[in-house]
Regions:
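Extended, subdomain-level signal for the structured scaffold at the beginning of enzyme domains
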Residues: 3-169
Length: 169
């Protein structure tokens, strides 16, 4: 009976250690943190539910969508550590897929024109549609326009845009 209890205690201890490791945020090589392996398993998916909707009457005009994205890569937490953040790839790229299928072009800006920060840890690696639109938009995401310049120079007289899109993150 004593050996059984010791064995059971060992199994419980290993389970607690595994749970602790799985729930601890992961430090990146840059010294920032991303969600724990358990959080990533529970809150992200390797695919999306994008169904490649075909719109019967896609937009055929010249107006575009202006996507305003974040360029902020890190958020300082209460303990002083930095959490890697940015635009969530699914919350940004799935709407772009739908907008493109609906007939719209999308322009990309960030507050100062620095590259769009993307939470790459949340990228659905097995989703071909998301990977394709990411590759298509990579240049725009790396070299976006500046929202500050847009507001100063173009906003007052701009009739180029049908909507402004603020993706989540």
């Amino acid at each position: 009976m004593k050996k059984i209890l010791i064995g059971l205690a060992g199994i419980i201890l290993l389970a607690f250690i595994a749970f602790y490791i799985a729930t601890k945020p992961t430090e990146t090589k840059e010294g920032t943190y991303i969600p724990s392996p358990l959080a990533l398993k529970l809150a992200t998916s390797p695919t999306t539910d994008f169904d490649n909707t075909i719109y019967k009457n896609p937009y055929t005009g010249n107006k575009k969508i202006l996507m305003v994205s974040t360029e902020e890569r890190n958020m300082t937490m209460a303990n002083g550590k930095k959490f890697s953040t940015g635009n969530h790839p699914v919350e940004m790229l799935l709407p772009i897929l739908h907008l493109k299928n609906a007939g719209f072009d999308v322009d990309v800006v960030t507050p100062t024109g620095k590259p769009v920060a993307i939470e790459m840890w949340a990228m659905p690696e097995d989703d071909e549609n998301v990977k394709k639109i990411y590759a298509e938009f990579k240049h725009k995401l790396e070299k976006p326009g500046s929202l500050a310049n847009f507001v100063t120079n173009s906003l007052k007289d701009s009739t180029d845009y049908a909507a402004i899109f603020f993706p989540g993150g």
